[in-house]
Amino acid sequence: GVYSADPRKVKDACLLPLLRLDEASELARLAAPVLHARTLQPVSGSEIDLQLRCSYTPDQGSTRIERVLASGTGARIVTSHDDVCLIEFQVPASQDFKLAHKEIDQILKRAQVRPLSVGVHNDRQLLQFCYTSEVADSALKILDEAGLPGELRLRQGLALVAMVGAGVTRNPLHCH
């Protein structure tokens, strides 16, 4: 099943009996080890029911994936990665920042290497793209080969903590 956090790291983590499809999709997009995006593909376009069990302790209960939009005002799940990389793209002052952001977004979409998270810093003309360490080199190569004017940097050895749940971005206690 899906827990509110990694039970090996958080002693108060609890099994979630129900997870909405959009929450499960976001968890999979964040590359959480508990759920892969391909698991959800057959579910999203059909009437298939999905029940998730923990491979370590399958008798401890399960999480059912429900096909309704999540409602609420905060995080239900905390997930993390201990080894992520940040690709930084410094847009030259002479370039249109919004246009550069749009171009890079299209390049990454076409290459199917969507980042876990994106930082957009208009004031510094800086774009940041967070990837797992397994994907970062590929994404960096794609951006480098695109030949966009600007400076690319790779920062390694970082960690990412993410919260998943309806309304996380609207809750000032859960989003900064």
Language model regions located:
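C-terminal catalytic "cap/lid" subdomain
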Residues: 1-176
